[in-house]
């Protein structure tokens, strides 16, 4: 399986994402600059955290216009797994690939610590290696991670089982404790916590690795078993 890590000006978690795929998952991965127009050779697309374009205007508001996002949109339409973490989640929302918005944290402070998440839906291509309601420890590092959507959108997220992760103790004011959501098709996941920073027991825990293992399992079942 071949992954692409999209690198925007100001990305700073791309190296962590690359390490998670290459060294921990053991799969092929490339850094791909934001001006690329073709992602056809990749099986999965990863949008890392950071401060793309300095977070000017709004987090992700400029990145959504990058050439690469047209290719990401195409990949999403093709059903390829798209994972956006932290700033990557913000970019997915700004691009319209996921509903809602990310606002300033409720306490108006940047937050950097490990939090507990509850796996709400383990039937997605990103969460199949977890148990439903499993509690996992994943780091956060954000100033604008307060997820918001209107009541109708929240109702749709609930009814369609699109909420992948919830905070056990809400750190930022996100509506309904939401930490991560998928699109209706189930192949686009956005989450504020950083699973790529929780892939090595020597560095504090590996409970985020299952996100990437789930992607790999889905791909193998689809393209290897059926080959």
UniProtKB/Swiss-Prot annotation:
Residues 3-225 form the Glutamine amidotransferase type-1 domain. It catalyses: N(2)-formyl-N(1)-(5-phospho-beta-D-ribosyl)glycinamide + L-glutamine + ATP + H2O = 2-formamido-N(1)-(5-O-phospho-beta-D-ribosyl)acetamidine + L-glutamate + ADP + phosphate + H(+); L-glutamine + H2O = L-glutamate + NH4(+). This is Phosphoribosylformylglycinamidine synthase subunit PurQ. It is found in: Cytoplasm. It comes from Bacillus thuringiensis (strain Al Hakam). GO terms for molecular function: ATP binding; glutaminase activity; phosphoribosylformylglycinamidine synthase activity. Part of the phosphoribosylformylglycinamidine synthase complex involved in the purines biosynthetic pathway. Catalyzes the ATP-dependent conversion of formylglycinamide ribonucleotide (FGAR) and glutamine to yield formylglycinamidine ribonucleotide (FGAM) and glutamate. The FGAM synthase complex is composed of three subunits. PurQ produces an ammonia molecule by converting glutamine to glutamate. PurL transfers the ammonia molecule to FGAR to form FGAM in an ATP-dependent manner. The gene is purQ. PROSITE patterns: GATASE_TYPE_1 (PS51273).
